[in-house]
Amino acid sequence: IGLRNLDLLLGLENRVIYTALEVLSGECRLEQALIKDKRQPGLALLPAAQNRNKDSINSDQMQYLVTLMNQQYDYILIDCPAGIESGFHNAIAPADEAIVVTTPEIAAVRDADRVIGLLEANNIKRISLLINRLRPQMVKANDMMSVADVKEILAIPLVGVIPEDECVIVSTNRG
């Protein structure tokens, strides 16, 4: 749904043959489109289509894809597009729970709060928080919100904190 980049981040971009759209159109089976990560047993990626149309997969189709994958996998993670447009609504349609990922910046936390409200309005009860790109030195200097600040504002359980790491940026850019 939306832009495709997880294949790049996982180093699987050269293995994409089919996408979720081909599964839905019947051009291929789910097993043909899933890319199994050889380094992580049990991890597979169903790539999104490489197009700009956030509405290319509707909520019923998302539900269908998740139903298919539920037969093989215990956990299915859906990387939602940023924002609160139709792509987001379509992506959350089959969700039982959600992990809201935000950076500790005022604008991002405000957006996360809005997303939490939308998740609750869509009857997703189990919502947790993952804080990404935390810079401890900036927090100490009062130039970035602390984990406690973000937790207090969003008032959902924290599942983890990922510190900023330049190595991740380098790795992502190199593939």
Please give the residue ranges for each predicted region.
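P-loop/Walker-type NTP enzyme "switch/lid" segment
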Residues: I1-Q71, I169-R174
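Conserved catalytic-core segment of NTP-binding enzymes
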Residues: D60, Y64, L68-Q71, Y75, ...
